[in-house]
Amino acid sequence: VKLGCCYYPEHWPEDWWAEDARRMRAMGLSLVRIGEFAWSRIEPEPGHYDWGWLDRAIETLHVAGLKVILGTPTATPPKWLVDRMPEMVAIDEHGRPRGFGSRRHYCFSHEGYRTECRRIVTALAERYGAHPALAMWQTDNEYGCHDTVLSFSDASASAFRGWLSARYGTPQALNDAWGNVFWSMEYRSFAEVDPPHLTVTEANPAHWLDYRRFASDQVASFNREQVDILRRLSPLVDITHNFMGFFTEFDHHAVGRDVDVATWDSYPLGFLEQFWFSRDEKAAYLRQGHPDIAAFHHDLYRGCSGGRWGVMEQQPGPVNWARFNPAPLPGMVALWTLEACAHGAELTSYFRWRQAPFAQEQMHAGLLRPDSSEAEAAPEVRAAAAVLSDIGPQATAQAPVALVFAYEAAWVTGIQPQGQSFRYLELVFEAYSALRQRGLDVDIVAPQADLSAYRMVVVPTLPIIPEGFIERLSGLACPVLLGPRSGSKTASFRIPEGLAPGTLRDAIPLTVTRVESLRDGVTEPAEGFAVTRWREDVASDLSPEVADAAGRGVVYRHGHIRYCAIWPDRALLRLLVERMAGEAGLDLIDLPEGIRLRRSASHAFTFNYASGPVFVPHLGETLAPASWHIAPR
C-alpha cells in the first residue's frame, strides 16, 4: 500500500512547499493529490492559463521523490464561467438554483459546461500527461456530493426527453410502460415530459425511476468524457474517481468500469454519526467508527472497478461536517490504514496534509495543524508505514461469500419505501455485518457478476431482477439467500404478473400475496428473533423453514435457495448465516464485540474496534483498544 496525502499548494506560501514535501517523505508518504479544486488558479481569466505555479508545485514534489495524483478541477467551476453561462448551475427539486459560493455548482446535463470541462481537461492532459511525477489522474471530485446528482434544470429536462426517446421510441410506449393512463398522466410527445418534481403529490414512481436512471447515466457519461481525453493524451497513467460513503445516487459500477482504480473517501466517525446507527452504537464506537463501516466500503469499491481500489481521503482527526465531530481514539488512524491494506488497497491518502485556517473546511483536521506542527495522526502514519514495510504487499484472496449490491435497488426502495424505516443501505449493511461477525470474508458484487466461485451468496434485496440473474442463481450449488422485496417490481416499476417475486418463482416456488410495514418499536414475537419493520404474507406449497410464534412463514427454502419474507433482525441473520455456512462447509468464528478479522492471500489481520481491551479467543491473547494482530496464514 502506498501512503499519500491531499495537498493544496495554492493555499500556502510557495516557500513552504519544499519543506512540506520533505516532511511528507519523512512521514512515509509517497503520493500527493493536488489540483482538484484549483480551476480559478489554473485559469484565472477565460482562456488565460497560469501554469507556472502548478509546474513548480509538481516539480517540487517530484524532486522530493513524491508522485502526484492530479485532479481535474471540474468540481469547482470559477465565477467567471458561471457568470458567462448562469444556466449551467443545477436546479434543486424545489426549483431553486444551486448557486456559486461553495462547490459542485453545475448540472451534469449542461452541454456548454461539458464543453468547458473537455477543454480544461485537455489542457491539463496535454501539459502534464507525460510528466514523470504523474502517478494517477483523478476525475472531478466526489460526484454527487451535496445532493448534486439530480438536477431539475432546463438542460436536464431537455436531455431527459432525449434519453426517453432513445429508450422508448414513441410516447405511447412510454405511456404504456409507466402506466400513465392512471390519473390522466398520458403524454402526446416527449416534449411534454418534465422532470418528476413540483407535482401536487408524489410523481409516478416509474417516472422517478427513469429519472434516476437518466441522472446516473449522465454522471457516467460526464466522467467518461474526461476519461476518454485522459486515455488519449496520457495513455500510460491510471485513472481514478473518489467515491463517497453510504452513497447510492448513481450507479458506481457504471463509473467504476471506466476507471482503472476505484477510490473512496473514508470518514468512519462522520459516517457513524450521520447515518442510521443506534444511540448505543454511536456511544460504543464514538471514536472508532462502527467496525464494519470502512470494511464495507473497501469491499464495495473493490468490486466496482474489477479489483483495483484505494482510499483517496482517510479521516485523520475530527471532521467538520457531521452533527458531532469527535476525535479518533489514539491508534485508530493507523488501524484504518492497516485495515485498508488487509482488504487489498493500493493506496491510502490522508485528507489533508495541513489543516486549513480559512474557509469552509477550517475545522477539518489534517496531518499538520494550521501552524504546521504535527497533529495527533502524524506519528500514527509513521507507525502504519513501518508495519506496511514489514509485511510487504498484500494480494486480495478470493472471499467465500458474495453479497449482491444493486444501486437500482436503492432507487426503487427509496422511491417507494412503503415504510419509513425501510432503508436499502441499512439492510445490506446489516447482512454484511452479520457475515463479518462470524469471521467470514465478503466480496460485494453487482448482480451481473459471475457468482460461480463463491460458497455462499447473499442477496439482501433485489426488487428488479436483471436478465440472466435467475439462470446464474439456479446454476449454483452453494446456499443462496434472497431478502424481502426481491422480484417485487418489473423494470418499468410494476407489480409483476402473478405477483412477487415475479420471475424468481422459477428458482423458488412461492407467491407474496400481501406486504405490510411496521412502525418503529412494533415487534411480532418469534422464537429467538423478532419480526420488525417489514413482513410479507407468502402462499406456497413449501413448508416454512423458519416461522414466527403464530406459525406464519418467515423463511422458505427450495433446494439451495432461501427466501426471507421479513426484514431480518440480527438474531435471524445470525441463524441464517450459521445454517448456510454449515451447508457450505465454512468454518465460523464467534468474534467478540468490536473484533473483526480479514484475510489477505498471505496474512490474517485481526482488529480491535472496541473502546477497551478485548480477549480474542482465536488468538489466545488480549488486544488493546485500537490495536491489531497480523500473522502469516
Identify the residue ranges that each predicted region occupies.
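A conserved amphipathic helix/loop scaffold
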Residues: 328, 460-633
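A short, well-structured beta->alpha microelement
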Residues: 431-451
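Hydrophobic targeting/anchoring helices
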Residues: 205, 240-430, 510-529, 533-534, ...
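Polysaccharide-binding and catalytic clefts of secreted carbohydrate-active enzymes
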Residues: 94, 98-300
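Aromatic-lined substrate-binding rim segments of carbohydrate-active enzymes
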Residues: 18-26, 31-98, 122-125, 226-234, ...
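The substrate-binding groove and active-site-proximal loops of carbohydrate-active enzymes
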Residues: 2-14, 35-54, 99-118, 140-149, ...
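Short, acidic/polar
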Residues: 11-26, 117-123, 244-254, 329-338
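Conserved, mostly hydrophobic/aromatic
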Residues: 5, 24, 32, 61, ...
